Amino acid sequence: MSPRRVTALVSLFSLSSIFVACSSDKSEKTDLTAELCPAKLTIQTDWFPELEHGGTYQLIGPSGTADKNSVSYSGPVQQQYAVGGLQEVEILTKNFDKQNSSVLVDAQADMAYIGIADLIKDSAALPLIAIAKTLDQDPQMLMWDPTQFTIKTPTDIAASGASFVHFPGLSYIDFMIDKGYLRPEQSDPSYNGSDATWVSKGGSILQQGFATNEIYKYENDILWKDGAPADVSFFTVSELGFDNYPATITMLKSRATELDACLKLLVPKMQQAWVDFYDNPTPITDRMIEINEEYDGFWSLSTELNLAGLQLLEEKNIGANSPDGTYCSFDETKIQDLYDILQPIYVSQGVEITDDVSSVYTNEYCQGAPGR
């Protein structure tokens, strides 16, 4: 064999070895990345499907499957959000039997919608951490019939003497009572999300709700006043001075630690889904109408309601970017201000909470997240 032939064979062998080694390294890295996330991700929301959950449903898109028995929506994650081996997403509606924090503790979901105010309240008792926002402002509101009550300022709520029907255990109720906006005897924690009490009482009560949903329903759909819909007035809780992050993506701290490498990849994708939803909400909001029909419960949506809700969401900056330009991170000053409001209230109630509010949230996983 000639020296030239030997040299050529050696060179060919060397190139082949390098190619195999590079291919092996690439394959190994791909395999490691593919195993970072669970194949199935379960997210517990705080209500039936509604536009305020749009970015979460965007992960699946309109082609998922609604299950009436489990009241859940599931399907393959859309390819543009697939990362770290994630294949399927399951979205659970509100669990009326337990708090969302208990759903996490019982390992029935990987993530759950929980507001920062409630995380503060439970901070000494439960090891939970918020990893991303879903909304920038809280659409939660207090509404009233303006023909029955003259309410111009928050203090007029207490002066009205009217019962305020709301869900139990809400932090903003503690705030309102502490500020003198609501007398303790006005608080009626019997709300179950339906319009039955309001209708039966002809709007002679105050009631909680989502400004981006119920305002349209009571003014256009629900026959509550003289056999017809009628105008209502409202304050959002932010307008009352309670500036909360609602429905944050929350996890058990131990689960977040376990999925740390996954979350660094996944959270920016989850927040991209929110940006994409806002850019083109109709496929998801239309599908939400159908999902609620398939659930066959008391909750319903309509095209007109969704359009009105999205308009109000923009007007009230409910879907605004964070100060750093992402649609993900938490404003440290905003959360500290909320903590400063709640801390003395809970001290007076004998409720133990953390001394360090930064322990209930992190912006670590928002690195690289997009903005609107």
Where is each model-derived feature located?
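Bacterial N-terminal signal peptides that target proteins for export
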Residues: 1-9
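C-terminal motif of bacterial Sec signal peptides marking the signal peptidase cleavage site
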Residues: 18-21
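Bacterial signal peptide processing site
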Residues: 23-26
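Short, glycine-/small- and polar/acidic-enriched structural segments
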Residues: 30-192, 205-208
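Short, solvent-exposed loop/beta-turn-alpha elements that line the ligand-binding surface or hinge
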Residues: 64-84, 229-242, 257, 318-330
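Pocket-lining segment of extracytoplasmic ligand-binding domains
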Residues: 117-118, 192-197, 201-296
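Secondary-structure end/capping motifs
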Residues: 257-348
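Conserved C-terminal helix/tail region of periplasmic/extracytoplasmic solute-binding proteins
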Residues: 332-372
